[in-house]
């Protein structure tokens, strides 16, 4: 369910159509995106916009129930992993719910993206900077 205001019309449209348990992916510049999944390409150049900039805007716009990450982020990108977990903790407090965080292999993560409503590609160029965001409800 849509909660705020996003200037990008494609992102706004996708979020407004999300139902309970639908998923939306925010990814780095290198994640392969299935042809069958809508692509919203925000990448301008390396690092612009960053993964966390996109995650921040998207997650404040929607009700988040869960997040799925690749297990590899823990070892290969620990700083970003901690930043993302901190953001989700703050979001959880703001929303008044518990956001379930789960992990899967990167290979399985790539397969799960095919079931998402859309993949939003950031300009991030650091390893495993990807998250599947699961929509919740505001009631």
Curated annotation (Swiss-Prot):
It is an enzyme of class 5 (isomerase). One of its GO terms (biological process) is D-ribose catabolic process. Pathway: Carbohydrate metabolism; D-ribose degradation; D-ribose 5-phosphate from beta-D-ribopyranose: step 1/2. Its EC number is 5.4.99.62. InterPro entries: D-ribose_pyranase, RbsD-like_sf, RbsD_FucU. It catalyses: beta-D-ribopyranose = beta-D-ribofuranose. It comes from the Bacteria. Coiled coil: none annotated. It is found in: Cytoplasm. Keywords: Carbohydrate metabolism, Cytoplasm, Isomerase. GO terms for cellular component: cytosol. GO terms for molecular function: D-ribose pyranase activity; intramolecular lyase activity; monosaccharide binding. The active site is at 20 (proton donor). Substrate binds at residues 28, 106, 128-130. Catalyzes the interconversion of beta-pyran and beta-furan forms of D-ribose. Belongs to the RbsD / FucU family. RbsD subfamily. Homodecamer. This is D-ribose pyranase.
């Amino acid at each position: 369910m849509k909660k705020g205001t996003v200037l990008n019309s494609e992102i706004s449209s996708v979020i407004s159509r999300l139902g309970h348990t639908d998923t939306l992916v925010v990814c780095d510049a290198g994640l392969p995106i299935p042809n069958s999944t809508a692509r919203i390409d925000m990448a301008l150049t390396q690092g612009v916009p960053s993964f966390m900039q996109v995650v921040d805007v998207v997650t404040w716009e929607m009700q988040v129930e869960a997040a799925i990450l690749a297990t590899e982020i823990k070892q290969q990108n620990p700083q970003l992993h901690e930043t993302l977990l901190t953001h989700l903790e703050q979001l959880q407090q703001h929303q008044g719910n518990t956001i379930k965080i789960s992990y899967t292999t990167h290979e399985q993560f790539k397969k799960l993206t095919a079931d998402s409503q859309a993949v939003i590609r950031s300009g991030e160029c650091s390893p495993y900077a990807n998250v599947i965001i699961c929509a919740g409800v505001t009631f």
